[in-house]
Amino acid sequence: MRNLLILVVVVSTIVATNVHANTGVAIVHGTGNPTDAYNKYWGSKFVESVRQGLDNSSNLIVVNCNFDKYMWDDAAAGCLANDLYNFINSKNISDLVVITHSNGGNVIRWIMSNPTFDTRYPTIINNIRWVNAMAPSSLGTPLADAVMQGNVFEQSLGWLLGFKSDAVRQQQVSWMAYYNQSWLLGTSGRPSLPKGFYTIVGTDVESAIWDPDSYCGGYFENVGLETTQNWLDRCSDGFINCSSQRGAGTLWFNDKDRTKGREPLSHNQSRRQCFNLDVILRNDI
């Protein structure tokens, strides 16, 4: 399906227009309220590697929004819409590739699912080529339920998920089931999203102290994710079950099918320069 879409886009461009698309990239973080997502959420090496896929290297934006709020909140989707709308207009972007991680996939899916909610949404939707969603929490995660119930996870997951924020509450499994059925497109039994939503799925966590791969993205973070994986399905990235990551849109690939050395991507590694993920994303622009 993805290859067919690429073929259609290429052929349509050749025969239908002489106007060269102006491609841009928006990189959208997950849960949290960062002020410097470029350095602290993604890492400069990841962002600058992805940037190399652009003809015009200035056509890239790294979003900083308050994704501790509900996805529809003005500080979340409103902030994202403002950044994307201004980016599209100021740079004359006509071909926007959106790269998301974790809960960021839910926020962009809210925008694509509710075009009448905000006057900026149609412009954004019309100019999106597709979304590449890394480890999206499309069906929620049991760990959000655990945090909201106030058990032992609340402290141990604070660095990853936050502490009983609106976004954590939203990502409870039953809550996401409601939103998917009522407000969001792209899941089973629901209409398709207006633009492609292609998922990259993290299937496992490795944290062996003797394995150099365990240190990519942060060794202690991977140790923590391997611990939380004990409360998830066998196929998970330590934070989100594979079934949730595949829950909306179209599967692009499972980590081991494309990564260097067939390495799995933990939830922390899927936002860092690990195992050629950055190169895969760069080559897809």
Model region roles, listed by residue range:
Residues 1-4:
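Positively charged n-region of N-terminal signal peptides that target proteins for export
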Residues 6-13:
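Bacterial N-terminal signal peptides
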Residues 15-21:
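Sec/Tat signal peptide C-region and signal peptidase I cleavage site
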Residues 22-96:
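Active-site catalytic motif of lipid deacylating hydrolases and related acyltransferases
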Residues 25, 77-183:
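Serine-dependent carboxylesterase/thioesterase catalytic core
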Residues 31, 104, 135-137, 203-206, ...:
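Catalytic metal-binding/acid-base residues of hydrolase active sites
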Residues 39-40, 141-147, 152, 209-216:
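Short aromatic-enriched loop/helix-cap "lid" or pocket-rim segments at secondary-structure transitions
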Residues 190-285:
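C-terminal catalytic-base region of ester-bond hydrolases, centering on the histidine
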